[in-house]
């Protein structure tokens, strides 16, 4: 990536966006009738699909059941054609396991699990195309799928990435910006309360700049919430029309 100018003197990024500007987001809910909830999202060229089953009885050993809340199970996978590498990734490889764990931690903080003790909620997310902000796209798709399943949440959980280039915080990083190797973080936020569901950081960043990058990610996550809220309202309206309400 040597020699590539990530931020021009005029304040424009490689893809023409301003520093705090999101890539275009398009999303749909209810894309799979067989699942309790489902959603598809595009954030720029990153595309993710999420399906949700539950709450249902614990599968396997009953000893896994939690007496005071639901067990949240999250599994992540990426299609072999999702990146330019065309590399076959075995199910359950390290990256997939780490992403599944991050998603579980995120949604345990957002779902009102205490309303469904001794039950299980399964969230499956697959990335169909990866072009930066993979974790964020997975969270945002899963949020819509959980809502589509009618599972109560404390709030939407909305996610976005951010990085730091030439003294400027950049929101919603593309693959080119991520590959440049600068400091970057991923944030999952409950926008109404401002509670952080998950924060992960790659590479070192001086504490003087951390607040700036964190605020860029939080602001972008709130912008994501505006989009997702509109998607949910549109879905509810379309469902009401189909039901004749």
UniProtKB/Swiss-Prot annotation:
What sections of the protein cross the membrane?
none
Query: Which domain of life does this protein belong to?
Result: Eukaryota
The entry lists its GO molecular-function terms as: exonuclease activity; mRNA 3'-UTR AU-rich region binding; RNA binding
Gene Ontology BP annotations: defense response to virus; DNA deamination; histone mRNA catabolic process; maturation of 5.8S rRNA; nuclear mRNA surveillance; poly(A)-dependent snoRNA 3'-end processing; positive regulation of cell growth; rRNA catabolic process
One GO CC term, this protein: cytosol
Keyword rRNA processing listed? The answer is yes
Modified residue N-acetylalanine is at which positions? 2
Its keywords, alphabetically, are: Acetylation, Cytoplasm, Exonuclease, Exosome, Hydrolase, Nuclease, Nucleus, RNA-binding, rRNA processing
Q: Which residues form a coiled coil?
A: none
Q: Where in the cell is it found?
A: Cytoplasm; Nucleus, Nucleolus; Nucleus; Nucleus, Nucleoplasm
Gene3D superfamilies of this UniProt entry? GHMP Kinase, N-terminal domain
Which InterPro entries does this UniProt record tie to the protein? ExoRNase_PH_dom1 (IPR001247), ExoRNase_PH_dom2 (IPR015847), ExoRNase_PH_dom2_sf (IPR036345), PNPase/RNase_PH_dom_sf (IPR027408), Ribosomal_Su5_D2-typ_SF (IPR020568), RNase_PH (IPR050080)
How does this protein assemble?
Component of the RNA exosome core complex (Exo-9), composed of EXOSC1, EXOSC2, EXOSC3, EXOSC4, EXOSC5, EXOSC6, EXOSC7, EXOSC8 and EXOSC9; within the complex interacts with EXOSC2, EXOSC7 and EXOSC9. The catalytically inactive RNA exosome core complex (Exo-9) associates with the catalytic subunit EXOSC10/RRP6. Exo-9 may associate with DIS3 to form the nucleolar exosome complex, or DIS3L to form the cytoplasmic exosome complex.
Q: What does this protein do?
A: Non-catalytic component of the RNA exosome complex which has 3'->5' exoribonuclease activity and participates in a multitude of cellular RNA processing and degradation events. In the nucleus, the RNA exosome complex is involved in proper maturation of stable RNA species such as rRNA, snRNA and snoRNA, in the elimination of RNA processing by-products and non-coding 'pervasive' transcripts, such as antisense RNA species and promoter-upstream transcripts (PROMPTs), and of mRNAs with processing defects, thereby limiting or excluding their export to the cytoplasm.
Family to which the UniProt record says this protein belongs:
Belongs to the RNase PH family.
This protein's name: Exosome complex component RRP41
The organism is Bos taurus (Bovine)
The encoding gene is: EXOSC4
